[in-house]
């Protein structure tokens, strides 16, 4: 580009010089023609010519060099006048051409100089940057760069309505399970995969486990500060802390021990382990153990057995894994979504998307064991509760409108979440009525989830 510019400037200068020379020569010729006053027709041996000279007598101008000879195409006076006009026109045109070339060259030079000034500034700035890079960096002056935008948002950054249109109305979108929000943008999955299930269980077993045993006998006392889920497996009687003994010999007694009314109200929520360790602990001892939801429905006489409950001193931190069995379907949908991307050739996929698909596959493989474990627990619970269904149909159903918020499940089908809400009106009712209107289990929801 610079070579073309230099060539244009050079040609412009040449044109200016040539036009200037033509202008000078044209002016000199016009001046010479104007200096000749008259032209006479002279007969020479070769023919007649118009001889123009400064002298009035043509015989005196034959030997002079400043004489003008013209061929008589027209009368001599007309030829002389026409020549003078042509020379003046040529002089004017040369002057105009010289002016145009000079202006064009000047504008081009100005444009070149204006474009070279930023280059000079950039060269000076680059030299200063080199000098700064040569210095020793100060940690206090370091400013961290702005992190790039997440590529997960471009992979799955549509609204929930659009998600349903893309995947289907009966599919749970993936961000509802492995979703996160970074600066108000819903991304595809968390940056780090969830921790392994075995590592979390081993850590919680060392820090947050505490067990207690219930002695055999007609009466059992429990701590008034915590709700205790009691159980009778084959035969025996069990009472609550109020001191009232059960006189029924054919019906079991499964109650939630309530604290004295003078004490403070119970905590609103008691959370057990998400994987229901009571069931796994009982499978090793070959002793059938029911969860709190199933124990409230049992109408058979069972023997008293030792039940180990694991409770945490503080609530567990939320982990990025599903909390209920109904989320297992979304895992299948996620596998289908990953399979769609894997159908494409690796050449068409960018490295970022390929790495994202591999991370999702690793997360799904790490959580398959956890979901199978939850399904096994639900199946075991269904087998235990199957014989007691005829007797449970005779129990009085609790109205959810009259006593809202008695049982809360964090998600539909959660096996290990039980909450007790303090109800002032229920405390003022007689205890017999409370026992008659005890809550029923959500085993139907669990069965539906398993199916």
Curated annotation (Swiss-Prot):
Disulfide bonds: none annotated. The chain crosses the membrane at residues 86-106. A motif (PPxY) lies at residues 148-151, 194-197. Residues 107-451 are cytoplasmic. Functions as an activator of the E3 ubiquitin protein ligase ITCH in the ubiquitination of the CXCL12-activated CXCR4 receptor. Thereby, triggers CXCR4 endocytosis and desensitization, negatively regulating the CXCL12/CXCR4 signaling pathway. Interacts with ITCH; enhances the ubiquitination of CXCR4 by ITCH and the subsequent endocytosis and desensitization of the receptor. Interacts with EPN1. This is Endosomal transmembrane epsin interactor 1. It comes from Mus musculus (Mouse). The gene is Entrep1.
């Amino acid at each position: 580009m610079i070579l073309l510019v230099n060539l244009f400037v050079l040609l412009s200068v040449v044109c200016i010089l040539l036009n200037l020379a033509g202008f000078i020569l044209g002016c000199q010729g016009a001046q010479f023609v104007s200096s000749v006053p008259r032209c006479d027709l002279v007969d020479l041996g070769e023919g007649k010519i118009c001889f123009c000279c400064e002298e009035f007598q043509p015989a005196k101008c034959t030997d002079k060099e400043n004489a003008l000879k013209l061929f008589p195409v027209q009368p001599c006076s007309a030829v002389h006048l026409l020549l003078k006009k042509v020379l003046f026109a040529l002089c004017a045109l040369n002057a105009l051409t010289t002016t145009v070339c000079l202006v064009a060259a000047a504008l081009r030079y100005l444009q070149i100089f204006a474009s070279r000034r930023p280059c000079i500034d950039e060269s000076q700035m680059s030299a200063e940057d080199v000098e700064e890079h040569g210095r020793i960096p100060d940690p206090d002056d370091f400013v961290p760069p702005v992190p790039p935008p997440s590529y997960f948002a471009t992979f799955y950054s549509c609204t929930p309505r659009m998600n349903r249109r893309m995947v289907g109305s009966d599919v749970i979108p993936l961000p509802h399970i492995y979703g996160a929000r970074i600066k108000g943008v819903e991304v595809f999955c968390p940056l780090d995969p969830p921790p392994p299930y075995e590592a979390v269980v081993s850590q919680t077993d060392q820090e947050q486990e505490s067990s207690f045993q219930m002695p055999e006998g007609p009466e059992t006392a429990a701590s008034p500060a915590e709700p205790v889920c009691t159980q009778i497996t084959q035969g025996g009687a069990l009472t609550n802390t109020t001191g009232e003994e059960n006189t029924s010999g054919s019906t079991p007694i499964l109650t939630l021990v309530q604290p004295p009314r003078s004490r403070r109200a119970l905590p609103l929520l008691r959370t057990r382990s998400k994987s229901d360790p009571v069931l796994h602990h009982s499978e090793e001892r070959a002793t059938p153990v029911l969860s709190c939801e199933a124990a409230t429905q049992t109408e058979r006489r069972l023997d008293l057995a030792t039940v180990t409950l694991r409770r945490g001193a503080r609530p567990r931190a939320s982990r990025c894994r599903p909390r209920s069995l109904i989320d297992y379907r979304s895992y299948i949908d996620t596998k289908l979504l990953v399979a769609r991307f894997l159908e494409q050739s690796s050449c068409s996929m960018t490295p970022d998307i390929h790495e994202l698909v591999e991370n999702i596959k690793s997360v799904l493989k790490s959580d398959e064991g956890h979901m199978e474990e939850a399904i096994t627990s639900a199946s075991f619970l269904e087998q235990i509760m199957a014989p007691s269904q005829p007797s449970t149909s005779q129990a009085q159903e609790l109205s959810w409108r009259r006593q809202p918020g008695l049982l809360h499940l964090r998600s539909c089908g959660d096996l290990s979440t039980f909450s007790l809400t303090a109800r002032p009106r229920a405390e003022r009712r007689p205890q017999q009525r409370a026992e008659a209107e005890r809550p029923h289990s959500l085993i139907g929801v669990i069965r539906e989830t398993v199916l």
